[in-house]
Amino acid sequence: MGKRYVVALKDAVTGVLYGGGGTFRILIDEESSGAKHLSCLVNTMNRGTRGSEHKHDVEHLWYILSGKGTMYIGGKAYAVGPEMAVFAPAGVLHRIDVGSDEDLTYVVVYAPPGPEQQLKQFGARAFDQR
């Protein structure tokens, strides 16, 4: 299959987040589109899910599509919901806790790419802090 510049959500590479607490969908990465400087995903975390604290060696951006939760970035808590953008610098610990009312769906951008490949290979275990 050739590189795709337009990818429908239904055609994304999909896997399980957080030990069954949600789903990742990789829309844009080097494998699918040839993107060398960023990747783009759409993730859904199930309501009531508590994410595991982790960090990446790359910058990380979220854009919340639906649902509400709390983002912890560098030890500080932020209430987040639809139409909000969130940024975590490279190397900074972060996690997401989802509220109990509804699932949390958000766009993720990694720049440069990399963490999405760990998700493909290891799923939720990719970012365990041990």
Residue spans for each PLM region:
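Well-ordered beta-strand scaffold positions
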Residues: 43, 68, 76-78
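Asparagine-centered strand-capping/turn motif at beta-strand->loop junctions
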Residues: 98-99
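A short hydrophobic beta-strand segment most commonly corresponding to one strand
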Residues: 40-42, 87, 102-118
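Short acidic-glycine-tyrosine-enriched beta hairpin
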Residues: 75-90
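A short, N-terminal "cap"/entry segment at the start of jelly-roll beta-barrel domains
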Residues: 1-38, 121-130
